[in-house]
Amino acid sequence: MNQVNESHSRASDIWREVASLFRPPGRLPVAEAIRRYMRVPRGANISGPWESSLTPYMIDPINTLSAREYDAVVFVGPARTGKTEGLIDGWIVYGIICDPADMLVVQMTETKAREHSRTRLSRTFRHSPEVCRRLSPSRNDNNVHDKMFLDGSFLKIGWPSITVFSSSDYRRVALTDYDRFPENVDGEGDAFTLASKRTTTFMSSGMTLVESSPGRDITDTKWRCGGAHEAPPTTGILSLYNRGDRRRWYWPCPHCGEYFQPVMDNMTGFRNNPDFVAAGQAARLMCPHCRGLIAPEQKRELNNRGIWLREGERAAADGSITGTPRNSRIASFWMEGPAAAFQTWEQLIFKLLAAEEEYERTGSEETLKAVVNTDIGRPYLPRSATEQRKSELLEQRAEPVPRRCVPDGVRFIEATVDVQGGKNRRFVVQITGYGEQGERWIVDRYNIRHSLRCSPNGESLPVDPAAYPEDWDLLLTDVFHKTWPLAS
């Protein structure tokens, strides 16, 4: 039986507290409830409110946690995005105050579960008055891994084991740092499948949350992206992301207004600088539409103007969204390091360049993999596989051009001639077309083997410019005065 606070001296106080247990669930959006009720610990005795304007990309994933059309929410992102604070701690606070129900939180190890309970949750509860007064006053009801509340709801903080995932039913289950879980939990299967089984009793009100930075290697080195939002083939959280509706984070360009993804592919200005600190300070994000440069000081403003788009959707410059979105029972979100609120571009670029230098110096990929996974927020492709893919990438870039024609984009052509002697004397001619930015095409390649001189039998003799200067005249007729048609 739930205990009532012993400090009450009047029957009306007892009745008021008992009556509060029968209140219907609050109708606040989850993010608004977190902003209103959760105090975020900033140290042992310092706290402040949760500020959605710092991490606006968390609002949609957080609010989706109460959407009945989804069975699960999957969030993929680098470290320093505020995902644990908002999605895990915030969801716990929302459940305690607005919609009480049993909840299971699974950390990657028993040690991390204990640490999360003691250093994050205990401080959050202590600094959040509305949470603190709902905790059961009984010492037997609260320990590191189990917490009971006055309304009878129960919070379990566990780790990946079949014992934790068996028997009990929970309306809410949260798996944090998922890619550091074992792929097979005690021989019973993956953690997501085991966890989601715990919520099925509650039907559409049950919800499973998974959040993590990528931590598994790409399994198919020959994979080619089938869509702008598709993740590479990996196990772990990106596999769950691909099952979902595949939402990516977009910014509006401050120059042209078009929406684009703030991802590492669009970072520029930091290569070829031996000073990694200066390189990080010079880093800018480039809009792929107008090639306008965005300074790091604009990140917070653009995050607050950003939107999530599902695969199949497109945002116009005026903010209108068109297209047919991908449908799924899983709402999945993926963002990369350039948009992370608590990591600067200077820090990100410095870590990347230092890790690449360490790889070049030692051949070890461990630091580089950690940076790609946790700072950039991408799955890692081993460098050995990258080298193997270079020929495939070149093949993908091949353009259909008719033979012996000048391709579109050529501004001028150049002829080079190599003189070959010996028994097989000849001129080797190559015609190369040059375009903008150093782009070039091979237009034609051929040999000039025969001169205009004839043997007593009337047969053409091989060229021999060293002995017969008139053989050089062949370059006028067969090279300089020769023409090639345009491809279009």
Task: Indicate where each model-derived feature is located.
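Phosphate/NTP-binding elements of NTP-utilizing enzymes
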Residues: 2-299, 304-305, 311-413, 417, ...
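Nucleic-acid-processing active sites and adjacent nucleic-acid-binding tracks
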Residues: 149, 380-410, 421-488
